[in-house]
Amino acid sequence: MRNKKDWTQLMEKLVISVGVTGSRITREQTPYIPITAAEIAQSGIEAWRAGASVLHIHVRDPKTGLGTQNYEIFKEVVDRIRGETDAILCLTTSGIPGRNLEFRERLVPLTFQPELVSFDAGSVNMRENVFLNPPEFLEL
Protein backbone atom coordinates (compact mmCIF):
# COMPACT_ATOMS: atom_id res chain seq x y z
CA MET A 1 0.00 0.00 0.00
CA ARG A 2 1.33 3.43 -0.96
CA ASN A 3 1.70 6.11 1.62
CA LYS A 4 0.35 9.61 0.99
CA LYS A 5 3.74 11.05 0.06
CA ASP A 6 4.25 8.46 -2.68
CA TRP A 7 0.75 9.10 -4.07
CA THR A 8 1.20 12.87 -4.33
CA GLN A 9 4.50 12.41 -6.14
CA LEU A 10 2.73 10.30 -8.77
CA MET A 11 0.00 12.84 -9.46
CA GLU A 12 0.12 14.71 -12.74
CA LYS A 13 -0.55 18.41 -13.04
CA LEU A 14 -4.23 19.23 -13.04
CA VAL A 15 -6.27 22.17 -14.31
CA ILE A 16 -9.44 22.81 -12.33
CA SER A 17 -12.06 24.96 -14.02
CA VAL A 18 -15.02 26.25 -12.01
CA GLY A 19 -18.30 27.54 -13.47
CA VAL A 20 -19.46 29.77 -10.65
CA THR A 21 -23.09 30.36 -11.69
CA GLY A 22 -24.02 29.18 -15.15
CA SER A 23 -26.82 31.07 -16.81
CA ARG A 24 -29.96 29.15 -15.87
CA ILE A 25 -29.97 28.03 -12.22
CA THR A 26 -32.08 30.25 -9.94
CA ARG A 27 -32.24 30.98 -6.21
CA GLU A 28 -35.53 29.08 -6.16
CA GLN A 29 -33.60 25.99 -7.25
CA THR A 30 -30.76 26.55 -4.77
CA PRO A 31 -30.30 29.34 -2.25
CA TYR A 32 -26.51 29.06 -2.65
CA ILE A 33 -26.23 30.36 -6.22
CA PRO A 34 -24.33 33.67 -6.36
CA ILE A 35 -26.38 36.39 -8.07
CA THR A 36 -24.83 39.81 -7.43
CA ALA A 37 -21.49 40.86 -8.89
CA ALA A 38 -19.96 40.81 -5.40
CA GLU A 39 -21.28 37.28 -4.74
CA ILE A 40 -20.09 35.97 -8.11
CA ALA A 41 -16.64 37.50 -7.65
CA GLN A 42 -16.35 36.20 -4.08
CA SER A 43 -17.34 32.68 -5.19
CA GLY A 44 -14.69 32.83 -7.91
CA ILE A 45 -12.06 34.06 -5.47
CA GLU A 46 -12.95 31.27 -3.03
CA ALA A 47 -12.75 28.67 -5.82
CA TRP A 48 -9.31 30.01 -6.82
CA ARG A 49 -8.13 29.85 -3.19
CA ALA A 50 -9.35 26.24 -3.09
CA GLY A 51 -7.23 25.35 -6.12
CA ALA A 52 -9.16 26.30 -9.27
CA SER A 53 -7.02 27.90 -11.95
CA VAL A 54 -9.78 28.73 -14.46
CA LEU A 55 -12.95 30.65 -13.55
CA HIS A 56 -15.76 30.36 -16.12
CA ILE A 57 -17.90 33.42 -15.53
CA HIS A 58 -21.51 34.21 -16.36
CA VAL A 59 -23.02 37.30 -14.72
CA ARG A 60 -26.55 37.96 -13.45
CA ASP A 61 -28.89 40.91 -13.25
CA PRO A 62 -29.19 41.41 -9.47
CA LYS A 63 -32.80 42.60 -9.83
CA THR A 64 -34.07 39.57 -11.75
CA GLY A 65 -31.42 36.95 -10.99
CA LEU A 66 -31.29 36.12 -14.70
CA GLY A 67 -28.22 36.01 -16.91
CA THR A 68 -27.07 39.24 -18.54
CA GLN A 69 -24.23 40.52 -20.69
CA ASN A 70 -24.25 43.90 -18.92
CA TYR A 71 -20.88 45.66 -19.22
CA GLU A 72 -20.91 47.22 -15.72
CA ILE A 73 -21.73 43.92 -14.01
CA PHE A 74 -19.00 42.06 -15.93
CA LYS A 75 -16.56 44.88 -15.10
CA GLU A 76 -17.25 44.67 -11.38
CA VAL A 77 -16.80 40.90 -11.34
CA VAL A 78 -13.63 40.98 -13.45
CA ASP A 79 -12.08 43.84 -11.46
CA ARG A 80 -12.76 42.13 -8.12
CA ILE A 81 -11.35 38.78 -9.27
CA ARG A 82 -8.29 40.30 -10.94
CA GLY A 83 -7.67 42.42 -7.85
CA GLU A 84 -7.25 39.33 -5.66
CA THR A 85 -6.20 36.43 -7.89
CA ASP A 86 -4.13 35.39 -10.86
CA ALA A 87 -6.91 33.09 -12.07
CA ILE A 88 -7.43 32.50 -15.77
CA LEU A 89 -10.76 34.09 -16.65
CA CYS A 90 -13.07 32.40 -19.12
CA LEU A 91 -15.90 34.82 -19.87
CA THR A 92 -19.00 33.74 -21.75
CA THR A 93 -20.10 35.02 -25.16
CA SER A 94 -23.14 32.76 -25.07
CA GLY A 95 -25.52 35.31 -23.65
CA ILE A 96 -28.76 34.03 -22.19
CA PRO A 97 -30.51 30.86 -23.41
CA GLY A 98 -33.96 31.69 -24.73
CA ARG A 99 -33.08 35.39 -25.16
CA ASN A 100 -31.26 35.76 -28.42
CA LEU A 101 -29.28 38.93 -27.78
CA GLU A 102 -27.81 41.21 -30.39
CA PHE A 103 -24.32 40.15 -31.39
CA ARG A 104 -22.70 43.28 -29.91
CA GLU A 105 -24.21 42.44 -26.50
CA ARG A 106 -22.84 38.92 -26.62
CA LEU A 107 -19.34 40.22 -27.35
CA VAL A 108 -19.20 42.56 -24.31
CA PRO A 109 -16.89 40.18 -22.38
CA LEU A 110 -14.19 40.56 -25.05
CA THR A 111 -13.65 44.17 -23.93
CA PHE A 112 -12.03 42.80 -20.75
CA GLN A 113 -9.43 40.82 -22.73
CA PRO A 114 -9.95 37.55 -20.85
CA GLU A 115 -7.46 34.74 -21.27
CA LEU A 116 -10.30 32.50 -22.52
CA VAL A 117 -13.86 32.93 -23.77
CA SER A 118 -16.58 30.36 -24.23
CA PHE A 119 -17.89 30.29 -27.78
CA ASP A 120 -20.75 28.02 -28.79
CA ALA A 121 -20.09 26.96 -32.37
CA GLY A 122 -23.63 25.90 -33.20
CA SER A 123 -27.26 26.42 -32.28
CA VAL A 124 -28.70 24.36 -29.43
CA ASN A 125 -32.22 23.29 -28.46
CA MET A 126 -32.75 23.79 -24.72
CA ARG A 127 -36.15 22.48 -23.63
CA GLU A 128 -38.64 25.03 -24.96
CA ASN A 129 -35.93 27.47 -26.13
CA VAL A 130 -33.53 27.63 -29.04
CA PHE A 131 -30.12 29.14 -28.45
CA LEU A 132 -29.17 30.63 -31.83
CA ASN A 133 -25.62 30.84 -33.12
CA PRO A 134 -26.12 31.74 -36.79
CA PRO A 135 -23.20 31.98 -39.24
CA GLU A 136 -23.33 35.79 -39.01
CA PHE A 137 -22.33 35.56 -35.33
CA LEU A 138 -19.86 32.72 -35.73
CA GLU A 139 -17.96 34.57 -38.45
CA LEU A 140 -17.51 37.84 -36.52
Kindly give the residue locations of the regions a language model identified.
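Hydrophobic faces of well-ordered beta-strands that scaffold small-molecule active sites
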Residues: I16-V20, L55-I57, A87-T93, E115-F119
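Histidine-centered catalytic micro-motifs
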Residues: V18, A37, V54-T64
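Glycine-rich anion/phosphate-binding loops
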Residues: Y32-Q42, E72-I73, R99-F103
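Alpha-helix-loop-beta-strand connector modules within alpha/beta enzyme cores
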Residues: G65-L91, E139-L140
